[in-house]
Amino acid sequence: PGEKARVIEAIRDAEQRTSGEIRIFIESRCRFVDPLDRAAELFWSLQMDRTQDHNAVLIYVAMKDHQVAIYADRGIHEKVGQLFWRKEVIAMTTHFREHHYAEALLEVISDVGEALYIHFPFDRNTDKNELPDDIIFGK
């Protein structure tokens, strides 16, 4: 399968173990100085704050600007803390420098999925897929 299909499959695999949600937004350029500000804007505009447990995570990538950010809702952020997200961004940036884009996304999806699983395990009686698993492409 292609890289896009592999990334979407990784999101689905991660979400099968947790009530948490993972989304990816990719665009060419970041119009903000800090990519985290852009990720936050997208998080809210995509209504990712509406998950039941406030455990959605947005992985943001601006390809041409070589910028990445991860924005997480308060439910998961309070569990794992700022250092976790910083380490994930550093790992993604390292892969991106070597043009290993799919590997970067697959690794962060796996790590975030594991954190979501630990703190928000899947419950077949109450959990449903609250957000689409597709990759969102901006301009």
Task: Give the residues covered by each predicted segment.
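Divalent-cation
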Residues: 1-17, 22-124, 128-130, 134-138
